[in-house]
């Protein structure tokens, strides 16, 4: 049976919950068109997150890996285009580490592009009435760290496996502690992630449509 690995993070930065795990854990053991979804939680910690991710990939042997993370302040489901080879942490991770201008992989390439049909995914999610867009930066915190490490692994050892990263907004119960911050319901995020998986499994060549910002 084919499997999809989807990951979410533990809470960080003083939050009580992390929306990525709150939604992703609901997808564990879900069957979609003969494909089994396996959900795993990652620690919000440099190095440790990649160790946990690589262990999960070894255990699950997925055909697709989707890493999901919180992007408080964003209003859309944002599908990341690129990961860069640098850790530059504005705040410490959950183990107290705060790397500044450190490469994720020594002698690794400057960046990796996603292995997902991101524009087709955005289009499909929007057609379901859920805000979505292509993002040009995954930041330089643990989310980018995981995306870069994932794509490095897939490019080096699992070239047939698709993979990438999706950022999601705060849940409403988080946004009440951040006046003015946008949020999205867990149900809408769940629908968006199910669509993302379905489209990623079906589409081999991405749509040739615009998705970039002006600035």
Swiss-Prot record:
GO biological process: proteolysis
Major localisation: cytoplasm
Reaction(s) catalysed by this chain's protein: Release of an N-terminal pyroglutamyl group from a polypeptide, the second amino acid generally not being Pro
Keywords noted in UniProt: Cytoplasm, Hydrolase, Protease, Thiol protease
Keyword Protein transport listed: no
Location within or outside the cell: Cytoplasm
CDD domains: Peptidase_C15
Residue positions of the active site: 80, 143, 167
Keyword hit for Hydrolase: yes
A Pfam family hit: Peptidase_C15
Protein role: Removes 5-oxoproline from various penultimate amino acid residues except L-proline.
Protein name: Pyrrolidone-carboxylate peptidase
Organism: Yersinia pseudotuberculosis serotype O:1b (strain IP 31758)
